[in-house]
């Protein structure tokens, strides 16, 4: 749709350049966007991050960190606990510490712009042991952490790891915390910015926020006024038979062409 909208201006003089960027690995590491930041380009005043927002301009979203907590114990026959060190026993304590940490984060941090107005910490997936009559020698827990704009991701990650280490102390097991991929930082831009206001007027939708992560932070780092906007719904994302409502296609093209005309034409 962006290409279709831009084609309208192929033979027209533009006072400001129009750039369409396609990035790699947007679903996980954001490697393409990180490379753009490292290379310092493209240079632009405004950026629209194409995401399924139902044509609603998004001025803020939460950060996303996915982490793995691993506990190494020692396996042995379950008939004699002294023969091993149970990794699941330690992980039980760690999970309790994470749940307490989640509550502390929610009590300290709120953002009125979000439907879920606190940071979230989800204990999403655990793998441990291999047999009920064997002391569990290894346990792995994967978690999803979503922080609000303004929160220091590095500081929270350090606090989380320290809570886990404290919970595991004295258990004769080894604990590590690692990231599945580099964290996606939170993003926030002025809700009354020029681009946000124009997209809001053209789409007849009030600016809002979302809890999923995007590349917006990285483009903003390059000095662009950045908005997340696009056709479709996140409800259909990551589902079998993803689809885009036909009713969104032409309005999206029309809106993009008006935005290009406003900011790029002489």
Q: What is each PLM-predicted segment?
A:
Residues 66-266:
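Metal-dependent amide/peptide-bond hydrolase catalytic core
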Residues 3-66:
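Acidic/histidine-rich catalytic neighborhood of metal-dependent amide-processing enzymes
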Residues 1-4, 43, 90, 251:
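Residues within well-formed alpha-helices
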Residues 1, 31, 210-214:
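Short, conserved clusters of charged catalytic residues that mark active-site
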């Amino acid at each position: 749709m962006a290409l279709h909208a831009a084609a309208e201006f192929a033979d027209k003089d533009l006072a400001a350049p129009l750039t369409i960027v396609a990035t790699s690995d947007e679903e996980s590491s954001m490697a393409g966007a990180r490379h753009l930041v490292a290379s310092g380009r493209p240079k632009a005043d405004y950026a629209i991050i194409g995401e399924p927002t139902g044509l609603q301009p998004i001025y803020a979203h939460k950060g996303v960190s996915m982490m793995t907590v691993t506990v190494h114990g020692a396996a042995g026959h379950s008939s004699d606990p002294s023969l091993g060190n149970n990794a699941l026993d330690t992980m039980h304590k760690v999970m309790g510490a994470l749940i307490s940490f989640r509550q502390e984060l929610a009590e300290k941090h709120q953002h009125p712009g979000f439907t879920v107005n606190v940071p979230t910490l989800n204990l999403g997936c655990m793998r441990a042991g291999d047999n009920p009559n064997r002391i569990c020698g290894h346990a792995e827990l994967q978690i999803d952490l979503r922080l609000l704009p303004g929160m220091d991701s590095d500081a929270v990650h350090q606090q989380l790891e320290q809570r886990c280490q404290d919970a595991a102390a004295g258990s004769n097991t080894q604990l590590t915390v690692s990231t599945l991929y580099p964290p996606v930082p939170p993003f926030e831009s002025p809700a009354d910015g020029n681009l946000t206001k124009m997209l809001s007027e053209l789409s007849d939708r009030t600016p809002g926020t979302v809890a999923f992560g995007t590349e917006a932070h990285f483009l903003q780092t390059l000095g662009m006024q950045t908005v997340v906007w696009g056709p479709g719904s996140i409800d259909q994302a990551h589902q079998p038979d993803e689809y885009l409502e036909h009713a969104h296609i032409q309005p999206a093209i029309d809106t993009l062409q008006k935005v290009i005309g406003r900011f790029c034409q002489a």
